[in-house]
């Protein structure tokens, strides 16, 4: 019988059997005098009991004493152990487990994890890097980055793939996790309620918890829709507000940029489903392939014989055989200075840029543009790029730190453009198009 697999990502710990997910639970714990609330129930009371709530015991897996004394747990390792016991029970008590873990885990944390498992009623038979396992299921030869988001940070894993998938580097972006995304959303939504219904949901713990409980639904809705209706009940009163997609993307822009700016331009991106579920993020990357939640488990199932080992000191696997039937292939990438476009040898000179159905003429004097706002003044601190036209043709120059894209490829400072090319921005669905206007 195939082993069960536990993916340790505290934004949603997942358990799979034979490649199919059977359990999902977040890495939250609320300490009570005589019990510990874990998982989703703990997450849904985190803002009701903030001092008793813990959500960093997986990311900071250690034996340092908890800040709040409790007879139920002494340190983060105790909380992790208690959650593993609960997961084992909820997942029909598997005898053997393979763990997939993020590249952010240190040797000491991996050793501590295996020590914790020795006190659990199951046996750990494998330990593998989550990014490596996911890529081994789908990716063909090339250079990739695997990007995944946890509760409090994002992990970018560099992978080289030939006959094998090999981890070559790990970059951790702190303070850029699901909780940071939700905190940003909560602040924006609270402001909207104050503006639209004179109600502040963050003034009381119960309504603040209700706000946070609904944020995942709001984000899913805005993946495909331009707006979402917000509602929070307080007593017998139903408070409502409306959230539009574009202001949300602007609010999340700084979080998105932390990740985008850390991605090497020459790499193909393998994007976890957690990031794919954030509105506008997938459009921020020029060469990206979304991964399903099951992908990492399929990689483990395909390579279980390689991953499995015996004894208390398991080998941490950071290289696996590459799939012979890849669903993802690296794509030829144009240099940032000259993004690829179709029929570039026949492309007409761009004379105008089409913004919100209005054509703006290009000339020697730069035209300054901002995502979602269109043409702005040269002195506008929020300008994102400038466009100008010379004898050599039209070109786009980045202004400020926001990543700018031409035809889906991020530019490096400046790039030429022709009629038919598109202009985009990190963290925004805004797309402007260059056109050639014929004069007679």
Where are these regions (language model features)?
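Gly/Thr-rich phosphate-binding beta-strand-loop-beta motif of the actin/hexokinase/Hsp70
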Residues: 1-25, 29-32, 138-168, 185, ...
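Conserved phosphate-binding loops in N-terminal lobes of ATP-dependent enzymes
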Residues: 11-100, 230
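Small-residue (GG/TT-enriched) beta-loop-alpha framework at ligand/catalytic clefts
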Residues: 99, 108-195, 254, 273-275, ...
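Phosphate-binding glycine-rich/basic clefts of nucleotide- and phosphate-handling proteins
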Residues: 160-243, 273-276
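Helical "lid/coupling" subdomains associated with nucleotide-phosphate turnover
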Residues: 221-336, 345, 363-366, 371-373, ...
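Forkhead-associated
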Residues: 351-440
